[in-house]
Amino acid sequence: LIEKSKRIVDLAKDLETDVITTHIGVVPNDPSHPRYAIMQDACGQLAAYADSMQAHFAVETGPEIATTLKGFLDGLHSKGVSVNLDPANFVMVTGDDPVQAVYTLKDYIVHTHAKDGKRLHYVSPEILYGMEESDMLNDASFIELPLGEGDVDFPAYFKALNDIGYKGFLTIEREVGDDPEGDIRKAADYIRSLI
């Protein structure tokens, strides 16, 4: 997978972009967990390659709280693996505050999502992201909603991005719903009304 990921960086550069968004799985809260070292090694190799190509693997937030992800990224000593901040994933999965996450992860944010949702009840990220088997996946633990209808405080989120000087992309993400295209249009109007 590491070599395949390097080829994806090559392709991205050929397409004249320097950000590749991805999921890496669940970073364990405990750095002594065996998976932590494996993830550090793999991401360290990818970070070094991305750095050499002046590119970024942007890890999408969600499976862990911001402080855990920051500690993991700090251990790489590189910006080659950075952050695609998805505020709804914090709300829906970990219950972490996406506004505070902007400040915590400010040195690593290279891409962001505009997505909204609500957590219905807690399910371990280890289960949600397939690290552990469970029947709980059959029971919806969160719901993605049109922008402005969930629990993400978008005025505060946009203020935080502005506070840290973020000037990159803000990608509207809508994966579900009866009218995703209509929801995306409404989301664009909603964002314009706030910025």
Model-derived features with residue positions:
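Histidine-acidic metal/acid-base catalytic patches
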Residues: 16-18, 44, 52, 66-195
